[in-house]
From Swiss-Prot:
Subunit composition and interactions: Influenza RNA polymerase is composed of three subunits: PB1, PB2 and PA. Interacts (via N-terminus) with PA (via C-terminus). Interacts (via C-terminus) with PB2 (via N-terminus); this interaction is essential for transcription initiation.
Record keyword Phosphoprotein present: yes
Major place of residence: host cell
Official protein name in the record: RNA-directed RNA polymerase catalytic subunit
RdRp catalytic domain span: 286-483
One BP annotation, GO: viral transcription
GO molecular function: nucleotide binding; RNA binding; RNA-directed RNA polymerase activity
Bias type Polar residues, positions: 55-64
Domain of life: Viruses
Location of region: Disordered: 50-82
Length: 757
């Protein structure tokens, strides 16, 4: 049947059709190969935007550095990083004047956080540049390796477990003349396989000690590793993102804590809130501008776009901001916050894996690592790559490029938002001292600007003034990509506003479907996504009902669990039919056991097991939820789990769903192929780490688990806990005298062993 697509929209208001224009169905593009080229682009562009700055050489590392601050006044239309310090400081002063006490209060809040944060905060986050192995690692492993190296080099402040003490170690490590590190390496040897009598390559992993001098260590500590940003929609070119190492992470965390605390108090900031809370905040600003623009005033809104936000920001500017924000605060606090921007002013960008060469004729492939780019003959490269390498060569040291200006993506989102809001704040009439005035919203590099004035000339003048003010602090509004409309229609961080926010439903499309965790979680997540979209995204009842039917169908095909009375033949149908025939109450079978679907849009909030519990046969209940059944996973299943939901763009969202432990909550095993690679040593470290944590949690069930205070180690805490528990159990008669004395003996032995060590 042919459908005329225009018929679909006859009853739909135009603004609701925005969803259909988004490129958000289907798989997003992923990058393959190395990010070296993208990283070189970033480095070269960043220097180009600041090219009229002053060149200096870092005395410790010998890296050439470009400083554009207080450089020439920026030119029109060309993006540039020449921020003027006095302008930034003045913007900060006016921001404080409009919000009395804001900086003071945020500093006090942050000081409290600084004193309480444990070093395990750094284990959050995914990939981290591990400077000891010179490549990316999971955050927890990278932290463990760093602490291990610090310890073997006589730095022990971090034993107390406070992040601030770990940062003291980082500072001390930078003064050391040399550091000794442990690296992993691979040995290959050819041996004859006893079974097949063929020759095979056997790999063994070794650890070796290596000394690193001060200069090399500093370069590693200041290095940001780079990767290609994956899954970016609507772009032809990929771009590079940075993963900083452990030395930088802690300092950045404290700066962002301070900035977050400031953003929470600013009505123009789109961070750190999200979702409906963010929409409410935005709607308030719009309402304020609409009500104040009485009949005499015009009100226009710019949907703004900034050119290369990160590459024109400058860490030196952030240092100036922090110095101002923390003026009157204790010296130690000011020092600890100023280290992150100082490290970023001296940062090095690691160029990634390098280039891969193929000779079609000789069927050869070879990799040119980034370290070789400084010396290799350029005749092997094509024109554009040659230009990139020539440009970057003066900046190269040991396969990393000196990158003083610019910020790299996603490092100081909150602090850069504070800078943006400080310019929006200058739009009040008392500062513009004329008939036009402005306000707006800022969320990292995205902004919306609302300008009010008596006539069109006033609007134009207001926009021009805003544009020029931004230029003075290194923000470059793009005249090509920003557009202006009567207030009431604009877009900000993918929220479309048209006299109220329009649900951009297409953004949520990728999160519909089967997640692939396990049968239990997938069912729960699937219905929760539909429920949430009915609440938040205008998903109507009829569409929701259809989405539900499609989901159930998808789910049955994924897990091959078609109804027991179906004609569809799959690998599981024999077992499921047998179960169907011997079940008295067929409605009680879970969908994943070939049962019928009892969900409709009224009961999406109830986990399937609970929905069908009363309908189940008794023996089926017993199998499904029996804690003695070896297939019921008891990996600390809470009553609420978190799923990571990927919207079409924007950060991954965490979504809560109800989790009921059944035979269907299985956990897939780790892929074994990792065991044959150089990652194996790391995997063993990780498992050791995991075992220790699990053991610790056995002693301290989550209800009674408070973070250890003071300097007792995990072992001491567990031993003292074991003694207390044993005494209570013995006195209440739960354990016999022999068991009690055996526990005491074990505790004593552990303490003895620790002393001898």
């Amino acid at each position: 049947m042919d459908v005329n697509p225009t018929l679909l929209f006859l009853k739909v208001p135009a603004q609701n059709a925005i969803s259909t224009t988004f490129p958000y169905t289907g798989d997003p593009p992923y990058s393959h190969g190395t990010g070296t080229g993208y990283t070189m682009d970033t480095v070269n562009r960043t220097h180009q935007y600041s090219e009229k700055g002053k060149w200096t050489t870092n005395t410790e590392t010998g890296a050439p550095q470009l400083n554009p601050i207080d450089g020439p006044l920026p030119e029109d239309n060309e993006p540039s990083g020449y921020a003027q310090t006095d302008c930034v400081l003045e913007a900060m002063a006016f921001l404080e004047e409009s919000h009395p006490g804001i900086f003071e209060n945020s500093c006090l809040e942050t000081m409290e956080v600084v004193q309480q944060t444990r070093v395990d905060k750094l284990t959050q986050g995914r990939q981290t540049y591990d400077w000891t192995l010179n490549r990316n690692q999971p955050a927890a492993t990278a932290l463990a390796n760093t602490i291990e190296v610090f310890r073997s080099n006589g730095l022990t402040a971090n034993e107390s477990g406070r992040l601030i003490d770990f940062l003291k170690d980082v500072m001390e490590s930078m003064d050391k003349e040399e550091m000794e590190i442990t690296t992993h390496f691979q040995r290959k040897r050819r041996v004859r396989d006893n079974m097949t009598k063929k020759m095979v390559t056997q790999r063994t992993i070794g650890k070796k000690k290596q000394r690193v001098n001060k200069r090399s260590y500093l370069i590693r500590a200041l290095t940001l590793n780079t990767m290609t940003k994956d899954a970016e929609r609507g772009k032809l070119k990929r771009r590079a993102i940075a993963t900083p190492g452990m030395q930088i992470r802690g300092f950045v965390y404290f700066v962002e804590t301070l900035a977050r605390s400031i953003c929470e108090k600013l009505e123009q900031s789109g961070l750190p809130v999200g979702g409906n809370e963010k929409k409410a905040k935005l709607a308030n600003v719009v309402r304020k501008m609409m009500t104040n623009s009485q009949d005499t005033e015009l009100s226009f809104t710019i949907t703004g776009d900034n050119t290369k936000w990160n590459e024109n920001q400058n860490p030196r500017m952030f240092l100036a901001m922090i110095t101002y924000i923390t003026k009157n605060q204790p010296e130690w606090f000011r020092n600890i916050l100023s280290i992150a921007p100082i490290m970023f002013s001296n940062k090095m960008a690691r160029l990634g894996k390098g280039y891969m060469f193929e000779s079609k004729r000789m069927k050869l492939r070879t990799q040119i690592p980034a370290e070789m780019l400084a010396s290799i003959d350029l005749k092997y490269f094509n024109e554009s790559t040659r230009k990139k390498i020539e440009k970057i060569r003066p900046l190269l040291i040991d396969g990393t490029a000196s990158l003083s200006p610019g910020m790299m993506m996603g490092m100081f989102n909150m602090l850069s938002t504070v800078l943006g809001v400080s310019i929006l704040n200058l739009g009040q009439k008392k500062y513009t001292k004329t008939t036009y005035w402005w306000d707006g919203l800022q969320s990292s590099d995205d902004f919306a600007l609302i300008v009010n004035a008596p006539n069109h000339e006033g609007i134009q003048a207001g926009v021009d003034r805003f544009y020029r003010t931004c230029k003075l602090v290194g923000i470059n509004m793009s005249k090509k990509k920003s557009y202006i409309n009567r207030t009431g229609t604009f877009e900000f961080t993918s929220f479309f506003y048209r006299y109220g926010f329009v649900a951009n439903f297409s953004m949520e499309l990728p999160s519909f479907g089967v997640s692939g965790i396990n049968e239990s979680a997938d069912m729960s997540i699937g219905v929760t996504v539909i429920k949430n979209n009915m609440i938040n995204n205008d998903l109507g009842p009829a569409t929701a009902q259809m989405a539900l039917q499609l989901f159930i169908k998808d789910y049955r095909y994924t897990y091959r669990c078609h109804r027991g009375d179906t004609q569809i033949q799959t690998r599981r149908s024999f077992e499921l039919k047998k179960l169907w025939e011997q079940t008295r109450s067929k409605a009680g079978l879970l969908v994943s056991d070939g049962g019928p679907n009892l969900y409709n849009i009224r009961n999406l909030h109830i986990p399937e097991v609970c929905l069908k519990w009363e309908l189940m046969d008794e023996d089926y209940q017993g199998r499904l939820c029996n804690p003695l059944n070896p297939f019921v996973s008891h990996k600390e299943i809470e009553s609420v789990n978190n799923a990571v939901i990927m919207p079409a763009h924007g950060p991954a969202k965490s979504m809560e769903y109800d989790a009921v432990a059944t035979t269907h909550s299985w956990i897939p095993k780790r892929n074994r192929s990792i065991l044959n690679t150089s990652q194996r040593g790391i995997l063993e470290d990780e498992q050791m780490y995991q075992k220790c944590c699990n053991l610790f949690e056995k002693f301290f069930p989550s209800s009674s688990y408070r973070r250890p205070v003071g300097i007792s180690s995990m072992v001491e805490a567990m031993v003292s806990r074991a003694r207390i528990d044993a005494r209570i159990d013995f006195e209440s008669g739960r354990i016999k005298k022999e068991e009690f004395s055996e526990i005491m003996k074990i505790c004593f032995t552990i303490e003895e062993l620790r002393r001898q060590k």
